[in-house]
């Protein structure tokens, strides 16, 4: 598997592929990409020994880190809902689909093999006007 970048921040060590699709116009749009958390990722340590799964907060951080690739100053202000349907296990490929609505509303779904593993509704700051593209 070719890995094009390593995400920084809390999700350090996760491998994020280039966006499959990114359609952002002003403050709305969508981003779809893939991520992979190797078995050695620190998120799996202690959660749970012998039965590793990615902690729920890292599902949220993954979405935020992907958004930060498109908007410089994205910060989480509220978790409206977070539904964890199935665990993300070590070495699984995770499809991440993010929809950006007006006034900071974010809807995200994480999937493994086409099956939803988490559904998130977040409120963020830092998405005002056109995106500040990072180089």
Tell where the protein language model's regions lie, with residue ranges:
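Catalytic strand-loop segment that frames the active site of acyl-thioester-processing enzymes
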Residues: 9-54
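A glycine-rich (often HGG/GG-containing) alpha/beta subdomain
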Residues: 4-14, 26-29, 84, 88, ...
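Hydrophobic beta-strand-centered segment that forms part of the acyl-chain substrate-binding groove
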Residues: 63-99, 107, 123, 127
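HotDog/MaoC-like acyl-thioester-processing domains
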Residues: 19-22, 28, 99-135
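Active-site beta-strand/loop microenvironment that shapes enzyme catalytic pockets
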Residues: 53-66
């Amino acid at each position: 598997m070719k890995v094009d970048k390593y995400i920084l921040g809390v999700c350090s060590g996760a491998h994020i592929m280039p966006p499959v699709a990114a359609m952002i116009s002003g403050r709305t749009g969508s981003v779809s990409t893939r991520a992979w958390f190797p078995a050695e990722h620190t998120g799996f340590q202690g959660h749970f020994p012998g039965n590793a799964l990615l902690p729920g907060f890292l599902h949220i951080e993954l979405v935020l880190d992907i958004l930060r690739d498109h908007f410089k100053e994205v910060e989480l202000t509220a978790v409206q809902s977070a539904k964890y349907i199935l665990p993300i296990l070590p070495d699984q490929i995770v499809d991440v689909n993010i929809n950006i609505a007006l006034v900071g509303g974010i809807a995200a779904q994480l999937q493994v093999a086409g099956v939803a593993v988490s559904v998130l509704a977040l409120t963020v700051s830092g998405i005002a006007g056109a995106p500040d593209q990072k180089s």
